C-alpha cells in the first residue's frame, strides 16, 4: 500500500512545496479548498495533508476537531506568508502525538 503527501492551498503555498519536489499538490481557494481537502482527507492512501490555515475558518467545529485529532492522515495547517501562526509545531506535536519535542 503506497502512501502520499498532499499539499492543498493557495498558489503561493502550493508553489513552494512543488519546488521542494512534492508532486501531489492542489491549488484551491474558498469553497473549492474545503471540497478538495475533504476528498483527500477521506482518501485511505493519503498519509499527510499540508493545508492552508485558512481552512480552519471555513469548516465547522466538529469537523475541525476530528481533523485535529486525526493521525491518518496527519493534517498540518500552515500559515500564508504575512499571517500570524496560531500554533507552533512543538505545541501541535504535544497535542496530537503526546510528545514534547521542545525538550529534545
From Swiss-Prot:
Keywords: ATP synthesis, Cell membrane, Hydrogen ion transport, Ion transport, Membrane, Transport. GO terms for molecular function: ATP binding; proton-transporting ATP synthase activity, rotational mechanism; proton-transporting ATPase activity, rotational mechanism. Its main location: membrane. GO terms for cellular component: plasma membrane. It is found in: Cell membrane. Pfam families: ATP-synt_F (PF01990). Has multiple subunits with at least A(3), B(3), C, D, E, F, H, I and proteolipid K(x). This is A-type ATP synthase subunit F. It comes from Thermoplasma volcanium (strain ATCC 51530 / DSM 4299 / JCM 9571 / NBRC 15438 / GSS1).
